[in-house]
């Protein structure tokens, strides 16, 4: 790790990047309807302390790995409650595949299954860059660690670099804070701090998706527990467009009922 590094952003996702055949109201079979990213910014000086705390917590609840999909409801809620006392800052992003429109065909034409993932990751990193700009944190002070998967991370680095060099792209302003060469990947089994990003992505996904395991209803408790840890509007309490990005917004996502109400609450400075 570079000596100038003061923070590490750990990133994981929930859902998948397949945009060809995904579940909709009309199609009950297929890939996940959402791709959701979760990220946790950890100060370097507290990393070892947090690793020890997570290792102790893992033993306390009697699990081998802190993978949110493997935890029962009460253990997940307890995990979220534990995060409240940690020195971390959370970020998230939600994309609903139905809103992609013509972009779906564009990806298919490119035969690039990673393009959608990278574009969503760039939106997430824009949220980090916004925070860094507000806090006066320089590009070389933050390292970015994605949960390792079969993915060409050079394409992501190149995308960030290209966007930074495109003046008419509004996102370039905040992405200028991101150093592409500081992006890397690490296996979840080798870094327990990635479990915090995993929990964040899982919790955000649960708040928008109709879950078979929950009788067709989303689950909001996890996000309610985590909400205080998300970066928010410095002048209020709003986290949407600060710590969380809903691409296209809750209405164009066709969120309904309690899921829509909950997502809209993220836009409120209450």
Indicate where each model-derived feature is located.
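Phosphate-ester processing/binding pockets and catalytic centers
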Residues: 1-270
């Amino acid at each position: 790790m570079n000596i100038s590094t003061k923070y590490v952003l750990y990133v994981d996702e929930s859902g998948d990047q397949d945009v060809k055949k995904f579940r909709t109201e009309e199609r009950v079979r297929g890939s996940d309807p959402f791709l959701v990213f979760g990220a946790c910014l950890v100060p370097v000086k507290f990393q070892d302390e947090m690793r020890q705390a997570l290792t102790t917590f893992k033993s306390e609840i009697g699990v081998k790995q802190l993978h949110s999909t493997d935890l029962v409801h009460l253990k997940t809620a307890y995990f979220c409650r534990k995060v409240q006392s940690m020195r971390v800052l959370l970020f998230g992003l939600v994309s609903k595949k139905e809103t992609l429109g013509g972009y779906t065909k564009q990806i298919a034409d490119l035969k690039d299954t990673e393009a959608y993932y990278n574009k969503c990751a760039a939106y997430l990193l824009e949220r980090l860059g916004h925070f860094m700009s507000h806090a006066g944190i320089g590009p070389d002070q933050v390292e970015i660690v994605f949960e390792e998967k079969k993915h060409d991370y050079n394409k992501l680095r190149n995308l960030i670099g290209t966007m930074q060099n495109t003046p008419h792209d509004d996102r370039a302003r905040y992405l200028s804070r991101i150093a592409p060469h500081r992006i890397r990947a690490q296996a979840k089994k080798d870094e327990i701090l990635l479990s915090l990003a995993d929990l964040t992505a899982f919790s955000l996904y649960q708040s928008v998706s109709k879950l078979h395991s929950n009788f067709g209803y989303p689950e909001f408790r996890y996000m309610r527990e985590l909400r205080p840890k998300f970066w928010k509007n410095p002048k209020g309490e709003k986290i949407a467009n600060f710590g969380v990005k809903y691409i296209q917004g809750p209405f164009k996502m066709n969120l309904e009922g309690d899921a829509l109400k909950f997502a809209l609450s993220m836009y409120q400075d209450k």
